[in-house]
Structure formats: structure tokens, C-alpha cells
Amino acid sequence: MQGLKVMISEEEITKRVKEIAAQINKDYSGKELKLICLLKGSIFYTVELSKYLTMPVKFDFMTVSSYGSGTKSSGHVKIKKDLDESIEGQHVLVIEDIIDSGRTLSELLPLLKEKKPASLKLTTLLDKPARREFDVDVDYVCFEIPDKFIVGYGLDYDQAYRNLPYIAEIVE
């Protein structure tokens, strides 16, 4: 059985998400924003962030993965669920749970740009720059973390731990 060590508390997450929302509110003042939640891991961050956004928002969802089961990236990016609506001419914010190698987003963002949004920005709850293999420009980062396998607040280990209200490291 693995144990969990809290890395980022629920209170720390809420505080930082409010700070990110304040910056997004400033950047998109007077505009409508389309939020693209990358399922499943980003759902917690998307919901929390959207509560503090003051502009009109619309939601869409994608399922994109480079993970199979376990803790390592499979090296293959799959779009399992595409957008339901066009993003042409809209201001779009892609919401990610964690950026590891950058492979998924390095392939996804160019595909989204082809759909001709008015603007396209990216936010992530967690960033692991030590693992980066592909260049990804991230506009809003909540937390930079070390190269540890973490769970909670939407992130899972074989579909478990997703419901934790905090970010934890799995320890042996």
C-alpha cells in the first residue's frame, strides 16, 4: 500500500487559483472567454477557477491523453473527445491539470490554432519544468513542482485519489 504526503494544501490551492483568476480577469476585461477543460484531470481546476472569473464564460471539454495506466507517459497523444463547438473568433483559455513532458500540449495547441480562435492562452494547475521535453508557452501557472508523481485535486493514479481536495505525493 502506498502512502500520501500532502504537497499543496486545499487552502494554498484556493489562494493561488484566486490570484490566477484576478490576472485572467484583468487580461480579458470586457471580453467573453471560452474555457476548454482538458478532461479528466482538469475538472477541479476548471470549476474552481471559473468561480472567480468575472467575464462571461462558456465551457467546452476535450479528452486528450499521453498516459496509459500507471505513472509514466506512453509517448503517444490521443484525442479521445474533441470540442463540441467551434472556437473560431473566440478568446480561448485551455485549462490543464499538469504539464510534464509537454508532449500533449505541443501537439494539441497547434491543432487548436488551426481552428482560428481570436486568441489562445494556456493555464495549468501544476508545472514540472524538470520533465519538459517539448517547448510549451504557459500563460498562467499556479504551482511549479518537482519531479514527483502526485495525485489529488483531479489528478489520479489508475483512476484513484482524484477526489482529494489537496495535492499529494505518492510515497512508498
Model regions: which residues?
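PRPP-associated nucleotide enzymes
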Residues: 1-172
